[in-house]
Amino acid sequence: MKRYLAVAVVLITLCGSGHAVASRNVSLQKARRGVAQAPADYYPPRGDGWRRKRPEQVGMDSALLEQAVRFARTKESRIPRDFSTQVETFGALLGPLPKERGETNGMVIRRGYVVAEWGDTRRPDPTYSVAKSFLSIILGLTVDRGMIKDVHDPVRKYIDDGGYASPHNAKITWQHHAQQTSEWEGAMWGKSHDFLGVEGFGKGRREPRTLQEPGTFYEYNDVRINRMALSLLRVWRKPLPEVLKQEIMDQIGASGAWRYHGYFNSDAVIDNRRMASVSGGTRWGGGLWINTRDEARFGYLILRKGRWRNKQIVSEQWIQMATRPSAAKPDYGYLWWLNTGRKAWPSAPETSFAALGYGSNTIWIDPEHDLVIVWRWHQGSPDELIKRILAAIKPTEASR
């Protein structure tokens, strides 16, 4: 009798173990099927075929989103359409300007799909200091390729054109340039680092001050960013617009409508070839002229951490570094504006960040909500539109 009981116990145990193994196998199969069935990120094709989805298809309320778009349409920039106040505001021009700008326009990209679009989003216009964030990504490419070994390296290690020869400028690193803490001293294309004088700098002129140690003091300064752009040109040994086109814009299917202009006097001679050095904005003319749709593609590339389909265009590590708060200015990274402490956009997650330019021109990126908003030629804080768009996201659909 005891023998039969022992056999029964063994059989029950084996059956139970078999059932557990079978259950685990079924669970693993379901998990594998779940991974296989998870939708891949959508990327728009080259051209105008960017897929649209109804707001409800991506977890948004169409009525609330439409209200947000109607609000955006009412916030036309007060900047004259003909740029007639440009010299008064910024000082003497060095480069071209279009005859007039477009009207306010924008796009909302949710989970990769167009869910809202207003105004003329195909018209290329100057995007002013949004160009700085494009330069940030070019710097990232340069580091990724090993052309710059370390962002903390002194620039003078790579550049020997006299711009970093002084004891003060010799201390400047690539990171200092990218965080706008370089305190570079000198002149670029007829504009001095100190921004002194009405003729050269208009209402943007500044008062004299003592230079600080590189890396310790933040100052928004286009002359210094123009110095960084020239240094990048010398490292690449080809025009940065070519680098941008070949390495980034062509890769993400951007249109051929954008142009990155230098100044009339910003040519440099490299390898017996005359090349225009570009600027970090359109303060003195020139700069990046681009349409909203191409800016949305660029923003989507950054949202996807530098990846476009199966190609890592700029490293995820660089995107992380570029959007990390700097010590001297916690709401600024490597030429990207951050929402540290939710001070810039109180309605938005602290992890959101943006490329910003005069105008106002905005590429706002929100990884938490899988969202890109491009808004051109608007007045007021972008937060007023951001909070309305975020309100349109259904609570159960907040994240991807």
Give the positions of each predicted feature.
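Catalytic-site signature segments of enzymes, centered on catalytic residues
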Residues: 113-122, 184-264, 286
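Active-site-proximal alpha-helical segments within enzyme catalytic domains
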Residues: 133, 137, 224-231, 286-307, ...
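N-terminal leader/targeting segments and the immediately adjacent pre-domain N-terminus
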Residues: 4-5, 9-10, 18-120, 145-148, ...
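Active-site-proximal loop and beta-strand segments within enzyme catalytic domains
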Residues: 51-52, 73, 77-98, 127, ...
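Active-site helix/loop module of the DD-peptidase/beta-lactamase fold
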Residues: 145-184, 236-285
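Active-site Gly/Thr loop motif
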Residues: 261, 266-282, 323-372
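Structured C-terminal helix/loop/strand segments within mature extracytoplasmic catalytic/sensor domains
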Residues: 354-400
